[in-house]
Amino acid sequence: MSLSEAEKRKILRERRQQKFSRGGASERLNKIVGGQGSQLDTKSALDEKPEVVEEIPREAVKPEMNSSVQAKKESTAQAKAEDPQVELFRQLAEMQGQGATESTPDLFSMMKNLGATGDSPFPMAEQQVEAIDPELVEYHKYRVNTLTAKTTLVKWIVLLAYIFLLTRTDDTYFPFVVRSYLPEVFTSQSSFFSIFLTFEILATSIYYQLSVGVERETGVKTLQDTSKIVSLVSMVPEGILPIADLRGKVILAMKYWNIIAMMIGDVCFVLVAIGLVSQI
């Protein structure tokens, strides 16, 4: 049996009235608007009391800041004290103030050793010099200086005897037998320069052969490890100057200069000896 539209509306009206009578509509309305039983948060932000922040007195903050600054200063000072570069410059400043003495450490050796550790502010050239025992270096210098002195003494004795042979024609110093066995080239005054130059070349060659033997025994290079000029040139970075292998060229120039200096010294000795012998 089908119901008419009027009957359907009547039945729906009765059902709604029954629901309202049970209070279901009021409960849903309260949930929507935030009433009793609502799931919405009805707490207002204005109802909350602000948190009270306790103010720290400035007198309490200032000591803390001072203590932190003081701690930073102390840590910085300690780091500087532990820095080997700072310690090196401090020692150099003390040496300049007190004056150099025999116990003053070698500046170039210290900088060279510092560069070898990688802490040096000065960039070194590609040719790095290995650290050598200072006592071994001093022993090598002693051997080389002794060899130089002995070589010079022997040369001057031979040159002085040769000068006597040329300038004194009587038999007071050289008997006739000695003169008779010597070739004429040694007794002729015109050949003095040739004999002198030949003698210098032979003496210099023997000297350098003996010095190479000393280097092999001690393991120290005379110019590379003991010359302060070479140490200074080694601090120049490669490429700054338009000269390839600057250190090697300086070493070669110093070798030639040593030869020339020895010859100049011998020439001066010969001139003085000739002047003295001629007065006898």
Curated annotation (Swiss-Prot):
The record places the following residue ranges in the Lumenal compartment, namely 167-191, 280
Principal place of residence: endoplasmic reticulum
User: Which cysteines are disulphide-bonded?
Assistant: none
An individual GO BP term: retrograde vesicle-mediated transport, Golgi to endoplasmic reticulum
Q: Which GO terms describe its cellular component?
A: endoplasmic reticulum membrane; GET complex; Golgi membrane
Q: How does it sit in the membrane?
A: Multi-pass membrane protein
Region annotation (Disordered) maps to: 1-80
Intracellular or extracellular location(s): Endoplasmic reticulum membrane; Golgi apparatus membrane
Does this entry carry the keyword Membrane?
yes
Keywords from the UniProt entry: Endoplasmic reticulum, ER-Golgi transport, Golgi apparatus, Membrane, Transmembrane, Transmembrane helix, Transport
Its transmembrane ranges are 147-166, 192-211, 259-279
Q: Where is the composition biased (Basic and acidic residues)?
A: 1-17, 44-62, 71-80
Give residue ranges on the Cytoplasmic side: 1-146, 212-258
Sample GO molecular function, one term: protein-membrane adaptor activity
The protein's job, in short, is: Required for the post-translational delivery of tail-anchored (TA) proteins to the endoplasmic reticulum. Together with GET1, acts as a membrane receptor for soluble GET3, which recognizes and selectively binds the transmembrane domain of TA proteins in the cytosol. The GET complex cooperates with the HDEL receptor ERD2 to mediate the ATP-dependent retrieval of resident ER proteins that contain a C-terminal H-D-E-L retention signal from the Golgi to the ER.
By sequence similarity, the record places it as follows: Belongs to the GET2 family.
Q: How does it assemble?
A: Component of the Golgi to ER traffic (GET) complex, which is composed of GET1, GET2 and GET3. Within the complex, GET1 and GET2 form a heterotetramer which is stabilized by phosphatidylinositol binding and which binds to the GET3 homodimer.
Q: What is this protein called?
A: Golgi to ER traffic protein 2
